[in-house]
Amino acid sequence: PDHCQTLLETLERYPNCKMVGNATTFRMFEQFYNTPKPEQYHQIKEGDEICLGKHTLVSYTMPMVHWPEVTCTYEKSTGTLFSADAFGTFGTVNGNIFADQTDFVATYEEEARRYYTNIVGKYGPQVQNALRKISSLDIKRIAPLHGPIWRTPETIEYILHKYLHWSSYTAEKKGVVIAFGSMYGNTRAIAQQLAKQLSKRGVTDIKIYDVSKTNPSYIIADAWKYTNLVTIAPTYNLNLYLTMENFIHELKALNFQNHKVSIIGNHSWASAAMKTMVAHFENDFKDIEIVSQPLDIKSSLKEEDIPLIEKMADDIKASIDAQEIK
C-alpha cells in the first residue's frame, strides 16, 4: 500500500491501461481495494518479457523480499534493475537522487542497515536466492522503491556486498551492544559498569541502549552489525521487564542469529528476568552462543558484584578476540 495508493484511481481514470503483475499481485490488489479489475490485468511470471519499443522489461520474482508478490524488473537496454524494496534505505533523499552524488557510506549505510534488518531481515534465505538470481545480469544501475539510485560500479558493488553480508546474519564489526531496561536506575548502573570494564580491557565500539527509550529498530540494526550483544533487565511482576521482553521478541521475529549473547538479570524478591532471557536465547533462536555465566544481581550493584562483572567482561573480550570478521 505504501507504493500503490493511487493505483485504483489510475485504473478507473484510464480504463484502457493495464496493470502488470503476477497472480499474487492481483489477489493482494483485490484484498486491499475490494474492486476487482480482471479486464485490466496483464499477468506475468518469472522470465517473461514485455517490449515497449525501445525498452524491454524482464520479470524476476523475489518472493518475501519482503512481500510474497514482489517482482523486480530488469530493463535490458539501460541495464536498470527496478528492485522493489530490495536495496532500499529509510529516510528521504536530500536533492541528490544518486548515491554517488553523496558520501554514500556516511549518508546511507546506517539507514540502509536499519531498513534491511527491520524490514527484510527475517528473510535472509530469500534474499540470498534473489541475489543468485540477478547475479548474471549486467546491472548498470539499481533503482529501489526507497532511498537513492545506485548507478556506478562502486556503489552497486557496495550495496550488493552489504546485502550478501546482512542476509548471512554475520557480524560486520567487532564490538558490543549493551541493551538494558531499568525501572529505578539500578540496572542502568550495571550496564554502565560492564561497559566500563569492557573499555578497560580494550574493547572498542561499545553501544549502550535503553530499551525503554530507544526505538527497537536502532538497537536491532546495531545488534546485527556487531559481534556481541548483552541484555540486562530486571524482573517485573514475576516476569521479564516488558520492554526487554518486547525487544527480544522483535529480535526473534526478525530471525536474529549467528551472534554471541551475554545476559544479566536483576531482582529484589523473586528472580525471573535472567532465567527468562536465557530460555529465550537458548530455545527461540538459532546459532546463538551464550558467552559467560549469566548473572543475577540482587536489587543494586554492590562491591561484591564487581568481580562477577569483571569476569563477564573478560569472557566477552575473549569472545570478541576469537571471532573473525569476513
Task: Kindly give the residue locations of the regions a language model identified.
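Di-metal (Zn2+ and/or Mg2+/Mn2+) metal-binding site signature of metallo-dependent hydrolases
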Residues: 1-11
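Short internal beta-strands
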Residues: 16-25
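Short hydrophobic segments within beta-strands
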Residues: 83, 178-181, 264
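FMN-binding flavodoxin-like domain, especially the glycine-rich phosphate-binding loop
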Residues: 93, 104-142, 147-149, 193-209, ...
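Terminal amphipathic helices with adjacent charged low-complexity linkers/tails
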Residues: 141-173
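Short, charged N-terminal beta->alpha structural module
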Residues: 179-200
